[in-house]
């Protein structure tokens, strides 16, 4: 079976010899080389160097590094599936929430009760984070949601039966979240009204939650104060005793603010709260730097092209910083970190080490892990899995500057839910970048597609919708007035620029398939993946106002040349090699 999955490596012919006079340099690791038939029919030849534990000497804590779901850390406790399914329905917005039916409501509350009393034997226990998220959602729905998404009759009957039992079995912090005023459940209780938390950090959090659970909003300083008080999250010590803040309270705050739809000041607080966590932000000596903010939880269906786009743009001095996580809930899809790790790159670079790669004339782009750049926020990975739905951080973490530039800066990110495009652009302007772009991409990602818009597409913002701004001077967005900044909104139709309409290639959580598509395209094989990389490199250059990209056709041709010359592929393998070298350089050399 292993020989079928990982055939012997095939030799790589000189793709660049016929299209470039420069001496070809093939930095492709042996286990990822393609032969001529592999380019015509994209099949990644992964050699015997890949075994169940290592790839090219790189250790994996995964059973199958070719699949995104295997990058979930085995040390993370799993959430209870029964309650998690209910959270999928109720921990969302005032129009998206789907009330539970009576049978499901009874099953969920019975599961919570049996877990609290230690009688749940056939499933994982219901975590404190799950309890906080679920009961916060129920409280907010009862207090301030429209009638259609308030409690169903079945939910009310289930709560009437189980609450007298739950109020005696649940810890006080969860009872507070479920009934903060002591009047919601129909039986008087003094626990909620009198609850203040343990210590000053929880006291601040409880005060904030009273506002959020009633459907209210918090100020900038209040949100930042809560976050800085409790993060990094430390739920238990080595001997198992509790420390830090209650996970139920924190999860209630995160999901509660999302359900209430965050205000601009709340999002700014999340975005900027830990900017100084690692000290002064390094400044790269590059003329142009684009920060790519892909969704941290990855792609589960479609080809993720941004890593390969960054390699293309670096060929003509458009530097890029990519940032994200190895694995992030709720989707747990394919990420740039998984691909780079699979290819043998070092994915634990600090921002200062990333600066070196940006300034390297043979590389020109870098990836920074959330784990290294924002350890406080990264400590929430387990909690984020247990609250199920995306917290405010899922929006704010996409608009970050882990490295700055001496030249112009831009931020590109994607969105899914209508309305968040304006919030993301607001955060970009607050960051002070010269240009910003948000894209309605497939799966909420930032990549444009070459597929045609369906004739019977649903209402709302279409895929390939772009909105952004471009500064006309070197002054930052914080310093210029509206006259000096051009705003734009458009829907990109790839057919208008000579692309054949094609569906986006599917990867379905396969890290291997995503790499295969990207490498095949960078080897010059024309097709949907190649077109998607060219479209996203050229259109981003044009929309951000990059030098040499004033005309769209010129920008697209420049991207094609970077691929067809072999330069983009060389840049990618330069990155793999140099990233490992940078990690071992003395700190004084960086």
Residue ranges and their predicted role:
Residues 252-258, 294-295, 329, 336, ...:
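Active-site-proximal beta-alpha loop/turn segments in soluble metabolic enzymes
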């Amino acid at each position: 079976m292993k020989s079928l999955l990982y055939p012997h490596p095939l030799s790589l012919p000189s793709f660049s010899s016929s299209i470039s006079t420069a001496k070809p340099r093939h930095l492709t690791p042996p286990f990822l080389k393609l032969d001529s038939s592999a380019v015509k029919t994209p099949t990644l030849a992964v050699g015997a160097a890949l075994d169940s534990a290592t790839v090219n000497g790189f250790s994996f804590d995964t059973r199958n590094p070719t699949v995104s779901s295997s990058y979930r850390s085995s040390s993370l406790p799993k959430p209870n599936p029964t309650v998690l399914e209910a959270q999928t329905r109720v921990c969302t917005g005032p129009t998206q929430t789907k009330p539970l039916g009576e049978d499901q409501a009874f099953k969920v509350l019975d599961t919570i009760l049996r877990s609290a009393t230690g009688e749940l034997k056939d499933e994982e226990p219901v975590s404190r984070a799950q309890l906080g998220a679920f009961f916060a959602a129920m409280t907010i729905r009862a207090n301030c949601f429209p009638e259609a998404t308030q409690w169903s009759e079945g939910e009310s009957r289930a709560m009437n039966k189980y609450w007298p039992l739950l109020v005696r079995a649940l810890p006080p912090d969860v009872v507070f979240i479920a009934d903060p005023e002591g009047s919601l459940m129909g039986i008087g209780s003094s626990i909620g009204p009198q609850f203040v938390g343990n210590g000053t950090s929880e006291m601040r959090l409880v005060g904030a939650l009273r506002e959020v659970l009633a459907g209210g909003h918090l100020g900038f300083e209040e949100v930042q104060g809560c976050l800085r008080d409790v993060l990094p999250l430390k739920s238990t010590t080595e001997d198992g005793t509790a420390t830090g803040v209650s996970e139920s309270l924190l999860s209630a705050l995160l999901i509660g603010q999302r359900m209430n739809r965050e205000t601009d000041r709340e999002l700014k607080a999340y975005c900027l709260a830990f900017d100084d966590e690692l000290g002064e932000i390094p400044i790269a000596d590059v003329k142009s730097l684009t920060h790519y903010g892909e969704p941290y939880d990855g792609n589960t269906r479609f080809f993720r092209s941004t890593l390969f786009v960054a390699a293309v743009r670096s060929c003509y001095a458009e530097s890029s910083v990519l940032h994200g996580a190895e694995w992030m809930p709720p989707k747990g899809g394919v990420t740039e970190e998984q691909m780079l790790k699979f290819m043998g790159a070092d994915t634990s670079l600090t921002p200062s080490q990333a600066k070196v790669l940006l300034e390297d004339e043979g590389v020109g782009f870098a990836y920074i892990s959330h784990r290294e750049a924002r350890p406080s926020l990264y400590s929430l990975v387990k909690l984020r899995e247990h609250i199920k739905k995306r917290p405010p951080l899922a929006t704010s973490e996409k608009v970050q500057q882990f490295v700055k530039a001496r030249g112009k800066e831009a931020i590109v990110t994607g969105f899914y839910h209508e309305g968040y495009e304006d919030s993301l652009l607001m955060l970009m302007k607050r960051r002070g970048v010269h240009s910003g772009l948000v894209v309605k991409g497939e799966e909420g990602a930032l990549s444009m597609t070459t597929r045609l818009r369906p004739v019977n597409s649903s209402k709302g913002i279409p895929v390939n919708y772009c909105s952004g701004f471009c500064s006309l001077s070197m002054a930052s967005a914080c310093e210029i007035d509206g006259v000096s900044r051009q705003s734009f909104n458009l829907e990109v139709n790839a057919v208008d620029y000579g692309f054949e309409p094609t569906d986006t290639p599917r990867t379905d959580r396969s890290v291997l398939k995503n790499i295969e598509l990207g490498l095949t395209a960078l080897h010059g094989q024309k097709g949907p993946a190649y077109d998607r990389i060219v479209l996203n490199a050229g259109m981003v250059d044009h929309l951000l106002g990059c030098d040499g990209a004033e005309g769209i056709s010129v920008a697209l041709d420049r991207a094609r040349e970077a691929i067809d010359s072999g330069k983009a592929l060389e840049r990618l393998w330069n990155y793999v090699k140099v990233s490992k070298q940078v990690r071992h350089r003395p700190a004084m050399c960086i």
